[in-house]
Swiss-Prot record:
Protein name: Acetyl-coenzyme A carboxylase carboxyl transferase subunit beta
PANTHER family to which the protein is assigned, alphabetical: ACETYL-COENZYME A CARBOXYLASE CARBOXYL TRANSFERASE SUBUNIT BETA, CHLOROPLASTIC
UniProt-recorded Gene Ontology molecular function terms: acetyl-CoA carboxylase activity; ATP binding; carboxyl- or carbamoyltransferase activity; zinc ion binding
UniProt-listed Pfam families: Carboxyl_trans, Zn_ribbon_ACC
EC number: 2.1.3.15
Natural source organism: Yersinia enterocolitica serotype O:8 / biotype 1B (strain NCTC 13174 / 8081)
Classification via Gene3D superfamilies: 2-enoyl-CoA Hydratase, Chain A, domain 1
Complexes and interactors: Acetyl-CoA carboxylase is a heterohexamer composed of biotin carboxyl carrier protein (AccB), biotin carboxylase (AccC) and two subunits each of ACCase subunit alpha (AccA) and ACCase subunit beta (AccD).
EC category: transferase
InterPro entries listed in its UniProt record: AcCoA_carboxyl_beta, Acetyl_CoA_COase_Trfase_b_su, ClpP/crotonase-like_dom_sf, COA_CT_N, Znf-ACC
Bias kind Low complexity: ranges: 287-303
Catalytic activities: N(6)-carboxybiotinyl-L-lysyl-[protein] + acetyl-CoA = N(6)-biotinyl-L-lysyl-[protein] + malonyl-CoA
Length: 303
C-alpha cells in the first residue's frame, strides 16, 4: 500500500458515477437553444415555451390534437407504396421506403382520418414530414382523394395540414400527376359548397404548395412557416439577387396577401372549430378555454 493510500482510507473515498439519462428525455429548441423537457414540450404541442418557436410535429399528433378523443377513424390505411419504376439513385427506392417506414411507423407521408371537432363531423389529413420529407407520391395522392371522397359522402368539411418538400422524385411522373389528381378532387368539394381549410406548416414547398396546399377556401399558416415553390437559395442563385429578410415566411406572405391568417398552434383547434361552425352554419363552439387546447399561453412571454 502506498503512502497516500495509507493517508486516505479507501473506505472514506466517495465513488462518483456519471448519471445516466435515457435518450429522448431532453431536447433543444432549434431556434433559441433552450434545453427542454421532452414530456413538457409534447404537452405544449411542440411549441417552445421560451421563444414560441413552432417545431415540426408528427402527422398523427396533429390529427389527435384536432379531432375529438375517441372519434378518429383512419382512412386509406391499407394503401401502401410500390416501387413500380424500380428506381435507384444512390440508394434503391424500396430501401428508402423501408427505412422511412421503420423510422416513422407510417406506410407513407400522409395520414387521413374522419372524426368530429367539438362535435362537428369533419375529415382531416396531415403530412408526415419525417417520411421522405413529406413528399407527395401515389399513395399520398390516393389517401388525400379518399379523404375528399369521405367528406363528400358525409357532406362535411375537410382540413389538411401540409408539411412537404414537394413531389417525390423516385416516382417521377406518377408523383407529379398527384398535383392534378388532388386539385380535381378539391374541385368537387367546391361544386358541393363544402369548406376546405388548408393549414400550411413548416415547410410547405414544391408541388404540394403548387396544388392542394394553396387551394383552401381559407389558407392558414403557422408562425414563421417556410412556404413557396422553389427554396430561397435556389431563387437567389437564379435571379442573382439577395432576397429580403423573411422571404417566403408566413409573415411575409400575409403582408402580400398570399395567405389569409397566421394562427399559433395552441389556438389552432379552437380557431378551426370557430371558422368551420360559421362556414357550415352551426352554433358557435364554446370558447371556455382556448388555453385548454394546449399548455402554451397565447403570449409566450406569459408562459
Amino acid at each position: 500500500m502506498s503512502w497516500i493510500e495509507r493517508i486516505l482510507n479507501k473506505s472514506n473515498i466517495t465513488q462518483t458515477r456519471k448519471a445516466s439519462i435515457p435518450e429522448g428525455v431532453w431536447t433543444k429548441c432549434d431556434s433559441c437553444g433552450q434545453v427542454l423537457y421532452r414530456a413538457e414540450l409534447e404537452r405544449n404541442l411542440e411549441v417552445c415555451p421560451k421563444c414560441d418557436h413552432h417545431m415540426r410535429m408528427s402527422a398523427r399528433a396533429r390529427l389527435h390534437m384536432l379531432l375529438d378523443a375517441g372519434s378518429e377513424v383512419e382512412l386509406g390505411s391499407e394503401l401502401e407504396p410500390k416501387d413500380i419504376l424500380k428506381f435507384k439513385d444512390s440508394k434503391k427506392y424500396k430501401d428508402r421506403l423501408s427505412a422511412a417506414q421503420k423510422e416513422t411507423g407510417e406506410k407513407d407521408a400522409l395520414v387521413a382520418m374522419k372524426g368530429t371537432l367539438q362535435g362537428m363531423p369533419i375529415v382531416a389529413a396531415s403530412f408526415e414530414f419525417a417520411f421522405m420529407g413529406g413528399s407527395m407520391a401515389s399513395v399520398v395522392g390516393a389517401r388525400f382523394v379518399r379523404a375528399v371522397e369521405q367528406a363528400l359522402e358525409d357532406n362535411c368539411p375537410l382540413v389538411c395540414f401540409s408539411s412537404s418538400g414537394g413531389a417525390r422524385m423516385q416516382e417521377a411522373l406518377m408523383s407529379l400527376m398527384q398535383m392534378a389528381k388532388t386539385s380535381a378532387a378539391l374541385a368537387k368539394m367546391q361544386e358541393r359548397g363544402l369548406p376546405y381549410i388548408s393549414v400550411l406548416t413548416d415547410p410547405t414547398m414544391g408541388g404540394v404548395s403548387a396544388s392542394l396546399a394553396m387551394l383552401g377556401d381559407i389558407n392558414i399558416a403557422e408562425p414563421k412557416a417556410l412556404i413557396g415553390f422553389a427554396g430561397p437559395r435556389v431563387i437567389e442563385q437564379t435571379v442573382r439577387e439577395k432576397l429580403p429578410p423573411g422571404f417566403q415566411r408566413s409573415e411575409f406572405l400575409i403582408e402580400k396577401g398570399a395567405i389569409d391568417m397566421i394562427v399559433r398552434r395552441p389556438v389552432m383547434r379552437q380557431t378551426l372549430a370557430s371558422i368551420l361552425s360559421k362556414l357550415t352554419h352551426q352554433p358557435q363552439p364554446s370558447v371556455d378555454g382556448v388555453k385548454a387546447d394546449a399548455a402554451v399561453a397565447d403570449n409566450p412571454g406569459d408562459a
